[in-house]
From Swiss-Prot:
It comes from Mus musculus. Keywords: Disulfide bond, Extracellular matrix, Glycoprotein, Growth factor, Leucine-rich repeat, Proteoglycan, Repeat, Secreted, Signal. Contains keratan sulfate. GO terms for molecular function: growth factor activity. Disulfide bonds join C255-C288. The gene is Ogn. Belongs to the small leucine-rich proteoglycan (SLRP) family. SLRP class III subfamily. LRR repeats lie at residues 112-131, 132-155, 156-179, 180-199, 200-225, 226-246, 247-277. SUPFAM superfamilies: L domain-like (SSF52058). Glycans are attached at N88, N258. This is Mimecan. The keyword Glycoprotein applies. It is found in: Secreted, Extracellular space, Extracellular matrix.
Amino acid sequence: METVHSTFLLLLFVPLTQQAPQSQLDSHVNYEYATGNSEETKFSQDYEDKYLDGKSIKEKETMIIPDEKSLQLQKDEVIPSLPTKKENDEMPTCLLCVCLSGSVYCEEVDIDAVPPLPKESAYLYARFNKIKKLTAKDFADMPNLRRLDFTGNLIEDIEDGTFSKLSLLEELTLAENQLLRLPVLPPKLTLLNAKHNKIKSKGIKANTFKKLNKLSFLYLDHNDLESVPPNLPESLRVIHLQFNSISSLTDDTFCKANDTRYIRERIEEIRLEGNPIALGKHPNSFICLKRLPIGSYF
């Protein structure tokens, strides 16, 4: 009787324990054993239920990977344009030197040529470097330059057109170099300092100073001059020619031989010491001066 009863109960519950649908099993397995992808599976199913309902099919959203050309276009839009050639030329100079309010200080930085300068530069101090030559290209398009100082370089030559376009240049210092001659000088020059070079008289043309009507200070001491440069302008106040090889003077060197009343008003100082000349033997050379030159008279 008990056996019959057990069999009856078994037959009663078997229909109630059917296998779950495959989709539910898959979902259950994904949830239990692949938890890392469970959300991804659920999102995919929801997406299909929502958009792929058989009536209005919409494209699935996809991730677009830009190609190399697209990336380059985006890059070009973000990165600012490169500096112009002028800016590239200026930046290195102002990193190596000091650029301040129109003045450029390039002292003792071992440059061997004139660096590119900001166009607004008015003063350049390039002292104690290794510059060997000056050319017209060094100062092209630099109309505002008023003072140049190249003291203590190795300059041997200066092209004649180097300063021709520097119409505002007033002070030019070339002291302590290796110059053998003077170039053509700009018309508004007030000071020329070329002391401690190797300049000879043949290295100065007859008209070098003739038209320099604003020149006040001339320093040519410690060179190899055999005579005083000709045609010195009336504007000169100070002339330094000491320690050269000057051995003779004429009545026209500083004065006018044919005009005994002529007085050279502006001359304040002439230095001729250290030359192989006895100034006392040339009294007529100084008759127009208010002060006698400094030097040996005997």
